[in-house]
Amino acid sequence: MEIHYEYAIKRGDHRIIVLPIYNMEALEALLTRRSCKSYRPEMPSEEVLNKILEAGTFAPSGRGAQAAIIVAVTNKEVRDQLSQMNAEILGTKADPFYGAPVVLVVLADRTKHTYLYDGSAVMENLQLAAHALGLGSCWIHRAKQEFDSEAGKALLKSWGIEGDYEGIG
């Protein structure tokens, strides 16, 4: 990693401290990531998927509460069930996941004051990591309605998730 230093500048009684500037690929990822609405049917490798999930777990959270959890849905039947639930909420028969072979569900604990922000930060980390690893992603909404439904609550229970969780994306 290449490091460039800038100098501290003093203006009047205020001293401005300028930290090192890093030539990082992260900035490029931030500027070039776009939502993808067409996917290849191949499942990403377990290694790639784990790197994306790990990046999601490093998202910031209010007071370190870690209110969000991520569920990687790689089972086609469950993925298709989620797709159907989401499509019904949207009022369409089309696949709202655009054929993506894996769906990452982010849920956040409603009892934490910053749960919506925490879950949203996880979503962004997941998307940036996917982009950095050459995969497309798209934040699909309606997860709140999905997991507030009886079918959604049954899925959470089958996954061993207990508590007051809201679907973020």
Regions found by a protein language model. Name each.
Residues 56, 111-155:
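Small-aliphatic-rich amphipathic alpha-helix that forms the alpha element of a beta-alpha
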Residues 94-96, 154-169:
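A glycine-rich helix N-cap at a beta->alpha junction
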Residues 69, 101-104, 136-138, 169:
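Structural motif
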Residues 88-124, 128:
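Helix-adjacent hinge/juxtasegments
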Residues 4, 13-14, 22:
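Intrinsic-disorder-associated, low-complexity terminal segments enriched in Asp/Asn/His/Tyr and depleted
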